[in-house]
Amino acid sequence: MRLDVECDGGSRGNPGIAGCGSSVLDGDQEVAARWEFISKATNNVAEYQGLINALELAIDVAGMRGVSPAELEIQVRMDSKLVVEQMSGRWKIKHPDMKPLAARVKELEATLAAVSYN
């Protein structure tokens, strides 16, 4: 099974009041969405949290359809060059705030058939 996810995060101030949103699409139809208020965070933390939420939500959608994560392919669309490059392995993860978030993304990715970023 293949699902697309779109996610974004942002902050007012950096750090500042932050939030993120994620949606799961099956073809061109949105099948699930989630928004989260993050209190105070940087833009990059909000972007990572949006990705984590998107992956978790896609796994939940697949589960409701009787599909295991191991059978799920996810195409991620997001505008954060930092997150895309780090998760694609092209950039190092240097900032200590990013490391646990990136580790959580990698944990989720390890349960899936495939994840691609664009």
Which residues does each predicted region cover?
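RNase H-like nuclease fold core
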Residues: 1-45, 49, 53-63
